[in-house]
Amino acid sequence: IDALDFATAENEPDALLDVAVLDGVLIFLGTESVEFWGATGDPDLPYAPIQQRVFEQGVIATGCVVVVDNSFVWIGADGITYRNGEVPVAISDDGIVERSKASASHRLWLLEDERHKFLCQRHDGNTMLYDVTTGEWSERQSYGRSNWRAGPGLGDDETGTIWELDGYVDAGGVF
């Protein structure tokens, strides 16, 4: 790969925090915007920005976007949880937004349990779950804690060790 082959956000050049892929479209989530890039068919420039397809609401932190049911959900920089459509649609209520704004850390992951998909949104002192099927929010806690101990994880195919999913380390070593 040529070191000069790179691309940057073009419609709204802001700091990139997260990336998702939905139906072959790359979704770049920055601090202030969400930008969509589609396949071009050109081997020298396989993806390019989709013109007029930008959301003017960025993501709050890395690890705060999930692809679910032919859409994606992210925690916006304003603390509101959004689901995409032609325009972003807020799915969080005022209570969820207040918890998000008051938190210094944020995490979003998907959990499937008994035919229900839940978006798990962790803040400093609480974990809120959004049932994708019913559209209802609930709170989960572990015994003796204000927060739920569960989190996103991966299993090692050789040792069976469970790792916490993190974008910066691999079993304690840097990627």
What residues fall within each predicted segment?
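A short, charged helix-loop
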Residues: 1-9
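Beta-sheet-dominated scaffold domains
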Residues: 12-174
